[in-house]
A protein has these predicted regions:
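C-terminal recognition in membrane/secretory proteostasis and scaffolding
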Residues: 1-137
Length: 137
């Protein structure tokens, strides 16, 4: 499956398999899934990107309630697909913080950019992750 692991956050595109295997409590995610084709959301979003997991790490210790939400914006830019999300999380000029806005969340997820790479190294080692992203089917 396609995915991104960034600073302990795991992002995946919403598809039928993910929708069937995960219990999404967020009404917005369910609505995005059911409206994707009938209401033409595919014209705006090639993928609906979901924050599916938050791996345990000091950088993510306060972020437990954000799993299962759809990503709206990263660093102020509306996300159109998984590759776009990856590009926004890995810009040429790194910001001080990565701000990830989720549809329906009370506040954004904020990750200190300098700590994201350190967290990824710890998480890769702890969970045996050899590749932090897979952007192709």
């Amino acid at each position: 499956p396609r995915y991104i692991v960034f600073g302990g956050l795991v992002f995946q595109p919403l598809d039928t398999n993910l929708f069937a295997s995960a219990k999404f409590d967020d009404v917005t995610v369910r609505r995005l899934y059911t409206d994707y084709m009938p209401k033409g959301l595919f014209q705006k979003y090639r993928d609906v990107v979901i924050l599916t997991r938050i791996e345990s790490d000091p950088i993510t210790s306060q972020l437990g309630d954000f799993t299962g939400f759809a990503v709206d914006k990263i660093n102020g830019v509306e996300v159109t697909d998984l590759k776009h999300a990856y590009d926004l999380l890995h810009p040429e000029k790194t910001p001080e913080f990565h701000v990830i806005e989720l549809f329906g969340a009370n506040r954004p997820v904020v990750i200190p950019a300098t700590k994201a790479a350190e967290a990824e190294a710890r998480i890769a080692k702890a969970y045996g992750i050899t590749k932090m992203e897979n952007l192709t089917d």
